[in-house]
Amino acid sequence: MYEPVREGEPVRFSLASPEPLPAGLLVHTRHVFGSACGEVAERSPAVPGLQTLSLFGVAGSDASALERLRDELRGPALALGVDCALTRGKMAERGPRLIVSDVDSTFIRGEAIDMLADAAGSGPRVAAITEAAMNGELDFAEALAERVATLEGLSVDRVESIADSIEPVPGADTLVATAHARGCAVGLVSGGFIEVIGGLARRLGVDCVLANRLETSGGALTGRTEGEIVTRERKAEALRRWSEGGRLPGADLPGGSDSPEGSNLPKDPDSPLEARGREGADARSRGFPSPRERIDLSETVAAGDGANDLSMMEIAGLSVAVCAKPAVLAAADAAVTRPRLDILAAILGWDAV
């Protein structure tokens, strides 16, 4: 939950766009930020293909200016199609230490459930349910069960083929690499399926994944899931537990002997999906907290696009709406309005790796 910037608090405001930053917006941004922070350090984060500006300062004593700061900076930028973020405290100084992102239409192109449904012949029906669930019009768990039921009989081989075709949104690899270079961990939370996203998470070096697991029998999907469903509450729980260096039952954590009992993998060791799911747990952590280490929630970022992401966004230090539904955009602290995640690195004030 956003609270006004406090006197003496480090503050950063960053802009990013693939188009030239409007001159009038730059004048406005420098004036508003300077009025609230006095002396300002200015730089342009180096992210290929983006025009950027990042202002850093220490909040002054004008309480009225600080109260209005976020809205006076954010509103004009978004109105002009420029993505932006206001960060504060330690995050303003060095960036976050943990980024947790939704997956479907945020970290990957499209919705995995819709891809599976197209293959199963239930695409239009499932797409309509997905849209309603994303808008918060349906109970997520019930909507998921209804959609997964339409996948009954879809072969494991077809699921593997779809998983192989999954692509991250542009810049996702840059965001992960840049975060790791800064000592920041990256986790994924998804109402989708570990069998679909596990391999991609491993290839990109994602530190931890929480997703649903598909039940299989005889080389095909049964139309059911296994284990506890990933709801908006479980997404928030994952962010909180991971920030504490804790273990979340049902999550794929950094692999090897450290993987917890009950990790989110298919239970059949002979299933072809077992290896694919296991890949998601094999990613080696570069910045993930140990059980003895704690990351304050003020140093976390939650990124998402739908109603199912709002609970984790509410508790994160910075909530980022990524190509989001209007209600999510209105609730978020920051926005990425284009399908490329290197913009998130830029508005955190980071140079891309």
Task: Say what each PLM segment does.
Residues 1-2, 8, 153, 158-250, ...:
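C-terminal cap/substrate-recognition subdomain and adjoining C-terminal extension
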Residues 1-101:
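Non-catalytic pre-domain segments flanking phosphatase-related domains
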Residues 45-56, 90-94, 104-214:
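Alpha-helical substrate-recognition element adjacent to the catalytic core
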Residues 97-111, 308, 313:
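Asp-based phosphoryl-transfer active-site loop
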Residues 252, 258, 264, 268-270, ...:
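Intrinsic-disorder-associated, low-complexity terminal segments enriched in Asp/Asn/His/Tyr and depleted
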Residues 261-263, 267, 275, 289, ...:
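Low-complexity, intrinsically disordered segments with a bias for serine/threonine
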Residues 23, 63, 67, 107-110, ...:
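Electropositive phosphate-/nucleotide-binding environments in soluble metabolic enzymes
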